[in-house]
């Protein structure tokens, strides 16, 4: 099989290209050479968390790999099979568990059987969706396509110390994924706020939550459900310190849109809650079915689905357009239409390939 050449500097030119390329290579068993890896970043080349994704997928697929080292600008990845089973994955310090999961999930869905993985690393870290978003928003939305996966957060890990622990269960998909046809959201059913802090006074999580609630309740009349997660000092198993908030809205016809914000040193807890609430309001004002982060995460699955998917996203991002470009490289037969401008709401139509191993 000829090697698929992928320029890692296309689109947003970051780690996302590598993650999606690895995921689709492992899934289709098409060998790839990715060059110019993270060429547009200040510290180009493979970083430790990208290396973990490579190592994990090497293990799952029995791949032959060349140049897999920190700082490498080019990598060769030749997968041979898709295994399932139990895995232990240590990403190291606060490397993002969510981003490694992004690379793993498509492969595990089409593996030989069901899979279980135990991942150590960062659950709530900068420049990455929090594990709460993956659990409550992403997995919920793609369940409409036939994906069955579950996440258990055993322990949180924040930057820079990490130490998070997450258990993941993935059910094998027996048939091709179903297409997704949801352009606009319907009536709002309610809001849910998840606010947490570790190795910090409990009032931090409470203040984050109250700030978000105050803003949302001033605009919306729908029910707001709160979940505040704190730990007494003598029973806090985390390395910490850290805090964060996820807010998501349940809307018809059975979708979720989310937003989040991370605490950091010197940032008032009230601002953490306020940031997440204001972002979610922006998402909802567009009337589209999916938030800006969900948009690019959905793209690989829309390429795999059997039939035509049509989704509305609150913002067409460079990440979304990059995900489409990577998808086209693996599935040139798929038809794609983007209706909208960069930075604006838009509609994505993809005629999927009905992928089955």
UniProtKB/Swiss-Prot annotation:
It is found in: Cytoplasm. InterPro entries: RNA3'-term_phos_cycl_insert (IPR013791), RNA3'_phos_cyclase_dom (IPR023797), RNA3'_phos_cyclase_dom_sf (IPR037136), RNA3'_term_phos_cyc (IPR000228), RNA3'_term_phos_cyc_type_1 (IPR017770), RNA3'_term_phos_cycl-like_CS (IPR020719), RNA3'P_cycl/enolpyr_Trfase_a/b (IPR013792), RPTC_insert (IPR036553). The active site is at residue 319. Keywords: ATP-binding, Cytoplasm, Ligase, Nucleotide-binding. Pfam families: RTC, RTC_insert. The keyword Ribonucleoprotein does not apply. ATP binds at residues 102, 293-296. GO terms for cellular component: cytoplasm. The keyword Cell cycle does not apply. Belongs to the RNA 3'-terminal cyclase family. Type 1 subfamily. This is RNA 3'-terminal phosphate cyclase. It comes from Desulfurococcus amylolyticus (strain DSM 18924 / JCM 16383 / VKM B-2413 / 1221n). The lineage of its organism: Archaea, Thermoproteota, Thermoprotei, Desulfurococcales, Desulfurococcaceae. The gene is rtcA.
């Amino acid at each position: 099989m000829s090697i698929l050449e992928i320029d890692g500097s296309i689109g947003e030119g970051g780690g996302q290209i590598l993650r999606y390329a690895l995921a689709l290579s492992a899934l289709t068993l098409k060998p790839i050479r990715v060059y110019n890896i993270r060429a547009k970043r200040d510290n180009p080349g493979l970083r430790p968390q990208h290396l973990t994704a490579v190592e994990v997928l090497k293990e799952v697929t029995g791949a032959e790999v060349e140049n897999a080292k920190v700082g490498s600008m080019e990598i060769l990845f030749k997968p041979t099979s898709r295994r399932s089973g139990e895995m232990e994955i240590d990403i190291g310090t606060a490397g993002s568990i969510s981003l490694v999961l992004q690379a793993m999930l498509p492969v595990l869905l089409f593996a030989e059987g069901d899979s279980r993985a135990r991942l150590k690393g960062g659950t709530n870290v900068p420049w990455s969706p929090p594990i709460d978003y993956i659990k409550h928003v992403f997995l919920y939305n793609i369940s409409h396509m036939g994906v069955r996966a579950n996440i258990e957060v055993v322990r949180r890990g924040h930057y820079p110390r990490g130490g998070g622990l997450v258990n993941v269960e993935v059910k094998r998909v027996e048939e091709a994924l179903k297409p997704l046809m949801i352009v606009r959201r319907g009536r709002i059913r309610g809001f849910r706020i998840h606010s947490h802090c570790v190795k910090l006074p409990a009032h931090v999580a409470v203040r984050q939550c109250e700030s978000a609630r105050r803003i949302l309740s001033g605009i919306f009349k729908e029910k707001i459900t709160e979940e505040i997660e704190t730990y007494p000092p003598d029973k806090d198993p985390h390395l910490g310190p850290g805090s964060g908030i996820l807010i998501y809205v349940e809307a018809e016809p059975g979708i979720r849109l989310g937003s989040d914000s991370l605490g950091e040193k010197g940032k008032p807890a009230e601002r953490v809650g306020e940031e997440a609430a204001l972002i979610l309001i922006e998402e909802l004002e567009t009337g589209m079915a999916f938030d800006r982060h969900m948009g690019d995460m959905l793209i690989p699955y829309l390429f795999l689905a059997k039939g035509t998917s049509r989704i509305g996203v609150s913002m067409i991002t460079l990440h979304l357009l990059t995900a489409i470009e990577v998808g086209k490289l693996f599935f040139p037969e798929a038809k794609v239409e983007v209706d909208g401008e960069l930075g604006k709401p838009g509609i994505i139509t993809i005629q999927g390939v009905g992928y089955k191993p």
